[in-house]
């Protein structure tokens, strides 16, 4: 949690991965850097960004800007998920389920960073297939975006929450 930066406007920013990439041209190789970041308000809003530049700080800055631009709202239930959810992107598949208070974030690598900045405090999760950070982040955000609160389901069906709970 120490490498999460608090920003003005209460956004938490987290750097997930920096990678050196190269383009081979006639005269040799052109090196550049890519950065993967996630941004969240710790209260159900989260977004990720992927930036590329000749220098690391510029790549990180581009990634942060992109992350702020494409944030989504996540319907959380008192610091955990509403229901078990699955998400996938290319070769990565993730499964997450709600956990009781005091469990903590049981998640690895890139998935943990997304859940921390989104404001999830208790969750059980597992990543299957590819553990490429970009794909895991996309799969995690896909799963969080597919999660529906009882209020959302009730509104979609044109019923009250009590009718849905049975």
UniProtKB/Swiss-Prot annotation:
Cross-referenced SUPFAM superfamilies: dsRNA-binding domain-like, Ribosomal protein S5 domain 2-like
Alphabetic keyword roster: Ribonucleoprotein, Ribosomal protein, RNA-binding, rRNA-binding
Domain S5 DRBM: 11-74
GO MF entry, a single one: rRNA binding
The protein's role, per its UniProt record: With S4 and S12 plays an important role in translational accuracy. Located at the back of the 30S subunit body where it stabilizes the conformation of the head with respect to the body.
UniProt cross-references to PANTHER family, sorted A to Z: MITOCHONDRIAL RIBOSOMAL PROTEIN S5
Subunit comment: Part of the 30S ribosomal subunit. Contacts proteins S4 and S8.
Domain remarks: The N-terminal domain interacts with the head of the 30S subunit; the C-terminal domain interacts with the body and contacts protein S4. The interaction surface between S4 and S5 is involved in control of translational fidelity.
Protein name as catalogued: Small ribosomal subunit protein uS5
The species this protein was found in: Haemophilus ducreyi (strain 35000HP / ATCC 700724)
Organism ancestry: Bacteria, Pseudomonadati, Pseudomonadota, Gammaproteobacteria, Pasteurellales
Gene of this entry: rpsE
């Amino acid at each position: 949690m120490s490498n999460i930066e608090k920003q003005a406007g209460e956004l938490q920013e987290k750097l997930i991965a920096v990678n050196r990439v190269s383009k081979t041209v006639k005269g040799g190789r052109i090196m550049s850097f890519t950065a993967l970041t996630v941004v969240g308000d710790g209260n159900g809003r989260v977004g990720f960004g992927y930036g590329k530049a000749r220098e690391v700080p510029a790549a990180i800055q581009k990634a942060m800007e992109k992350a702020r631009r494409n944030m989504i709202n996540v319907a959380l239930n008192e610091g955990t998920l509403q229901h078990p959810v699955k998400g996938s992107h290319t070769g990565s598949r993730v499964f997450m389920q709600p956990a009781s208070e005091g469990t903590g974030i049981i998640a690895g690598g890139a998935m943990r960073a997304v859940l921390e900045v989104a404001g999830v405090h208790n969750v059980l999760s597992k990543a299957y297939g590819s553990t490429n950070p970009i794909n895991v982040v996309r799969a995690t955000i896909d799963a969080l975006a597919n999660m529906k609160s009882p209020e959302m389901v009730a509104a979609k069906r044109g019923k009250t929450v009590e009718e849905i709970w049975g």
